[in-house]
């Protein structure tokens, strides 16, 4: 269903652009330094928009069907043609370089550190989109490395950093308190999210012990979200 593909891909693009925009606003404030290169930020956006347009046209008209480089891959959420994926990687590298140089040249805080960790790991996980093995079980394992570890891992780190920044600016609460909450939320997200990937491995051909690991750690995945909600209420 092309409409569904465009809908779900639009959601991902919307969130990623939101993360990019938040980082470009948040990092200079926290680092007390201007963005390393505004020109690179515009270049990154142009590549991202061009890639998005290419995806829409490819999906709508089913262009280059079956082509290794130019055709869509038919894998949910990561259907993009390889040339678009390569463009996404280039845009991500430009973004990470720009943000990292800004942080390194300025003031380092827990907020910028956790944000950078989330953004770097998010980008590295996307590299699994280039791995498309013939074995369906292996394909699903690599697929979940992206889909699950984005939602239940890296995105939580980015969201927690943004939330901490907002609480700091809106409530005037002590930075030390905010940073303690942030570290707790980040630790919970990584602890529950990484091994919680196992709940996607139940019936795809992986060893049986993943049923136990997935079941146990999946039950903790709600904790970081609850912690973020509690953090907001306590701070306000």
Indicate where each model-derived feature is located.
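Membrane-interface helix-loop-helix modules in multi-pass inner-membrane proteins
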Residues: 2-103, 130-134, 193-217
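Alpha-helical transmembrane spans of integral membrane proteins, capturing the lipid-embedded, hydrophobic core
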Residues: 45-52, 118-122, 149, 153, ...
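Hydrophobic, membrane-embedded alpha-helices of multi-pass small-molecule transporters
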Residues: 88, 123-129, 149-160, 218-222
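Aromatic- and glycine-enriched pocket-lining scaffold segments that form the walls
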Residues: 110-128, 144-146
């Amino acid at each position: 269903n092309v409409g569904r593909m465009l809908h779900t891909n639009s959601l991902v693009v919307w969130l990623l652009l939101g993360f990019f925009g938040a980082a470009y606003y948040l990092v200079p404030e926290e680092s007390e330094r201007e963005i390393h290169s505004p020109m690179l930020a515009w270049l990154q956006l142009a590549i991202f928009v061009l890639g998005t347009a290419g995806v829409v046209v490819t999906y709508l008209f089913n262009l280059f069907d079956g082509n290794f480089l130019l055709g869509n891959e038919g894998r949910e959420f990561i259907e993009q043609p390889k040339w678009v994926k390569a463009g996404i990687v280039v845009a991500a590298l430009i973004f990470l370089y720009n943000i990292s140089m800004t942080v390194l040249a300025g003031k380092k805080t827990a907020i910028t550190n956790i944000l950078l960790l989330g953004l770097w790991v998010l980008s590295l996980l996307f590299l699994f989109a280039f791995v498309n093995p013939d074995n369906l079980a292996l394909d699903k394992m690599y697929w979940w490395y992206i889909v699950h570890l984005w939602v239940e891992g890296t995105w939580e780190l980015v969201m927690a950093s943004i939330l901490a920044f907002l609480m700091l600016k809106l409530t005037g609460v002590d930075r030390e308190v905010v940073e303690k909450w942030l570290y707790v939320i980040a630790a919970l997200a990584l602890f529950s999210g990484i091994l919680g990937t196992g709940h996607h491995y139940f019936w795809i051909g992986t060893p049986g012990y993943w049923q136990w690991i997935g079941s146990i750690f999946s039950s903790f995945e709600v904790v970081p979200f609850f912690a973020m909600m509690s953090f907001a209420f306590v701070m306000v």
